[in-house]
Amino acid sequence: MSQDRRNDYDVTNTVQVSNPVAVRNAVNALFSETFPGTSFDKLWLAFYDFERLFTGRYPGYKGCDTTYHDLQHTLDMTLALARLVAGYERSVEPPDRLGAARAQMAIITSLFHDSGYIRHETRDRDFTNGAEFTLYHVSRSADFLRRYLPELGLARDVGVASMIVHFTGYELDLDHIELDDPRDIICGHLIGTADMIAQMADRCYLEKLSLIHI
């Protein structure tokens, strides 16, 4: 294998983070190892719908047209989140572990954390580019999760997912986010950390900085 880091590969140079199937398989391996015997079906569907959303094949949506917050960034971030979750589960006592259901929710939230940049065909017809939503895109992502999770059979996760997605932005003061279970707050911090790690570990991070708001 070449010693040079490839532009669209993760920090280990082993997973092509521009390829949804490659990232899905890597996340599946981590999830199955961390939570043996747990179904990956809903996560498989979430990856499928994520790819459709960002490529313009999800009903009612135009696809991703922002230069920086694209499919590759989200896949890179979701892989980082899955690795953080796996490491966290190994490092804490059993009562403090997130568990499979909460980990699943965190991964799905990661997949759609930038869905607020995607324009809807009718609701957003007055906008010409997803970058116009930058200042409030996380709230739009939360709205997308509120609509999407029940379709996936995960209505129970709506309340938490629509809050912890805000750990990827600045629209809410994180110190003021209150959730009943501290493990949900941990998920939020892991998601926010994964978002930052994925950005800074990107092989082309410096080159992409000028594109971050377009």
Annotated model-derived regions:
Residues 77, 104-125, 141, 162-171:
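His-Asp-centered metal-binding catalytic motifs of divalent-metal-dependent phosphohydrolases/nucleases
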Residues 149-210:
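Histidine/acidic-rich helix-loop-helix segments that form or flank divalent-metal centers
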Residues 1-64:
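Non-catalytic interface/linker regions that flank or bridge core catalytic/transmembrane domains
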Residues 62-105:
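Alpha-helical phosphate/pyrophosphate-handling elements in metalloenzyme active cores
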Residues 77, 84, 134-151:
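An active-site-proximal "capping" alpha-helix that borders the catalytic cofactor pocket
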Residues 66-76, 128-140:
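Active-site metal-coordination segments of metallo-dependent hydrolases
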Residues 212-214:
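Conserved small/polar residues in nucleotide/adenosyl-binding loops
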Residues 102-116, 188-199:
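Active-site alpha-helical segments that house and flank conserved acidic catalytic motifs
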